[in-house]
């Protein structure tokens, strides 16, 4: 788990807000991939806090922890802008079976977002793993795509400027198929790992009509869910090849050799191609005989022709 530091132990650095701003720069799905050793709910709450302090309305679909536990550690200024949709206490809606939403929790959440005020909207899903266990993967992917789009339905609020979805995924609980399907929808992927008591976030950002970028940040989460970047650890940003695409060598399946040796090139140049005219035929075509009305047959034996001395046709003058 990420180590929680007190405010007296560390000195805040301005790059911490830069990391959060880069994750919240655009809309779409931001996928947080955590593990048993490196949990991601702390980073999810840090992003929620950042969005709320920027004046955005934040909707949280809580599935794994209670509302009280989720709000713990967030200030009153953040909790006042947080709308919590509780699926933890009654996930199957047994207490009110007559009011169950047949479309599912994501559809109900989408309808709530239509009534939001002007500005950007952040939707936090805690977690996608719980939803994958209760909703078919195809249905969930379709709902995520619709959820992260702006004004895709006639009933949507036209005042909503941007919809951002923060999805927490416990990667170890799922196979490569569901993880790859959800990952293909994400504009930004954050994979949490680390060494000793230091957490690292490997961030893959995909932007339309731009090359993907890859960053690694080392950080700690404070008790108030602010971030502090560690000093002395390298922060790097570089061009990143999408892991879902494989690099193909264009010369691996050629039927010919691109690079010839000197001896091979001389042998190639000495060959006579089958469609080349012999010198006799070239002269006949370039200098036709006047008055000739009959056709002529030109034959120039190849080096591998089998000449039969007893064949009477070989005596013909053609």
Curated annotation (Swiss-Prot):
Keywords: Cytoplasm, Nucleus, Phosphoprotein, tRNA processing. The keyword Metal-binding does not apply. Tyrosine-phosphorylated. The modification Phosphoserine is found at residue 270. Belongs to the ELP5 family. Component of the elongator complex which is required for multiple tRNA modifications, including mcm5U (5-methoxycarbonylmethyl uridine), mcm5s2U (5-methoxycarbonylmethyl-2-thiouridine), and ncm5U (5-carbamoylmethyl uridine). The elongator complex catalyzes the formation of carboxymethyluridine in the wobble base at position 34 in tRNAs. Involved in cell migration. This is Elongator complex protein 5.
């Amino acid at each position: 788990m990420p180590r929680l530091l007190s405010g007296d132990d560390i000195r805040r650095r301005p790059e911490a807000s830069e990391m959060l701003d880069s994750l919240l720069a655009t809309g779409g799905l931001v996928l947080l991939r955590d593990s048993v050793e490196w949990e991601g709910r702390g980073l999810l709450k840090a992003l929620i806090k950042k969005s709320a302090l920027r004046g955005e309305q934040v909707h949280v679909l809580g599935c794994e922890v209670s509302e009280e536990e989720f709000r713990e550690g967030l200030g009153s200024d953040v909790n006042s802008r947080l709308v919590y949709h509780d699926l933890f206490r009654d996930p199957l809606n047994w207490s009110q079976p007559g009011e169950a939403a047949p479309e599912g929790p994501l559809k109900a959440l989408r309808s709530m977002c239509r009534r939001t005020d002007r500005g950007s909207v952040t939707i936090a899903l805690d977690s996608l793993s719980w939803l994958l266990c209760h909703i078919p993967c195809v249905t969930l992917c379709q709902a995520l795509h619709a959820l992260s789009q702006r004004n895709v339905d006639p009933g949507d609020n036209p005042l909503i400027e941007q919809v951002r979805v923060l999805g927490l995924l416990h990667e170890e609980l799922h196979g490569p198929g569901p993880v790859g399907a959800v990952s293909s929808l994400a504009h930004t992927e954050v994979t949490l790992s680390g060494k000793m008591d230091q957490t690292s976030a490997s961030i893959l950002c995909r932007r339309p009509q731009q090359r993907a970028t890859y960053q690694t940040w080392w950080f700690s989460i404070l008790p108030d869910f602010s971030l502090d970047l560690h000093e002395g650890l390298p922060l790097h940003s570089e061009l990143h090849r999408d892991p879902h695409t494989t690099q193909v060598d264009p010369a691996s399946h050629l039927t010919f050799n691109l690079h010839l040796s000197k001896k091979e090139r001389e042998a190639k140049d000495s060959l006579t191609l089958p469609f080349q005219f012999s010198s006799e035929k070239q002269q006949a075509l370039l200098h036709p005989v006047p008055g000739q009305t009959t056709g002529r047959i030109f034959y120039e034996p190849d080096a591998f022709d089998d000449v039969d001395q007893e064949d009477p046709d070989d005596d013909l003058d053609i």
